[in-house]
C-alpha cells in the first residue's frame, strides 16, 4: 500500500479470536483494543451460541462495543481511541467468544505480539502469514524458559509460521517490576525489505534504514 505521503509501505492485518470461559458463578471482564490514525479496527464482535432456526445453535453477535477517546487530558488531545466490550457471565461454565480484526496502515506500527495476557489460557496460538514478496524477520525473545512449539509450512505464495504455547498463566503485576519485554516470551516483527511492482523497497534491514526513517519523521515536523 501507500502512506499519506505516497511512500510505499507494507500493510498488515491482525485477526484475533478468543474463547472466554467463566470459572466463577458470577464474573465480568472487559475486553478492549486501542487504535489511532495508523490503525483501523475493521471488525469487533462478541459472539455467543444461541438457538436459531430449526433449533441449531450458531454464533450470533451479541456484544455492544463502546468506542471512545483513550486520552483523558483536559488540555491535550491525541488520536488514540479505545473500543471495548463489558462482558458479563451469569454462571460457572458460561462461555463467550470475541473476534476482532485490526488493519495496520503501515506495518512499522505492528511491532510485537505476546503469548501472555491478563487472563490465563489453556492454549495460545500465534500464526504469522508472510507473502513471498515480503522479507520479514521474526525475532523470538525469552523463549528459553517456556515450552513453545514452532511449525513452518507453506501455502500459496506465502510462508506460514505457527507458534503454540499450552497452559499459559496470566500476567503477574508486581510493584516496581521490570517490563514484560524482559521476562515474558514474545515475537518482534521486523520488515527488512519488500517488493513493490518489481522494485525492492527497504524496511529496517540495518541501523542505516532506521536512521533514514527517523530523519524522515524529523523532516515532517513543524517547529
Stretches with model-predicted labels:
Residues 1-221:
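Beta-strand-rich, non-transmembrane domain signature
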Amino acid at each position: 500500500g501507500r502512506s499519506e505521503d505516497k511512500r510505499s509501505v507494507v500493510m498488515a492485518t491482525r485477526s484475533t479470536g478468543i474463547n472466554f470461559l467463566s470459572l466463577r458463578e458470577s464474573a465480568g471482564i472487559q475486553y478492549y483494543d486501542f487504535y489511532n490514525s495508523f490503525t483501523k479496527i475493521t471488525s469487533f464482535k462478541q459472539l455467543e451460541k444461541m438457538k436459531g432456526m430449526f433449533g441449531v445453535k450458531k454464533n450470533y453477535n451479541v456484544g455492544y462495543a463502546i468506542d471512545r477517546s483513550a486520552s483523558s487530558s483536559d488540555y491535550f488531545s491525541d488520536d488514540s481511541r479505545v473500543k471495548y466490550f463489558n462482558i458479563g457471565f451469569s454462571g460457572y461454565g458460561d462461555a463467550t467468544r470475541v473476534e476482532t480484526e485490526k488493519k495496520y496502515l503501515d506495518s512499522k506500527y505492528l511491532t510485537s505480539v505476546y503469548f501472555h495476557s491478563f487472563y490465563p489460557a489453556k492454549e495460545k496460538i500465534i500464526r504469522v502469514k508472510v507473502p513471498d514478496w515480503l522479507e520479514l524477520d521474526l525475532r523470538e525473545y525469552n523463549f528459553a524458559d517456556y515450552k513453545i512449539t514452532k511449525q513452518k509450512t507453506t501455502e500459496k505464495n506465502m510462508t506460514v509460521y505457527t507458534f503454540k504455547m499450552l497452559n499459559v498463566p496470566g500476567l503477574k503485576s508486581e510493584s516496581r517490576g521490570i517490563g514484560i519485554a524482559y521476562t515474558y516470551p514474545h515475537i518482534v516483527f521486523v520488515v527488512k525489505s519488500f517488493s513493490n511492482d518489481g522494485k525492492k523497497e527497504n524496511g529496517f534491514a540495518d541501523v542505516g534504514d532506521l536512521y533514514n526513517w527517523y530523519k524522515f519523521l524529523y523532516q515532517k515536523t513543524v517547529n
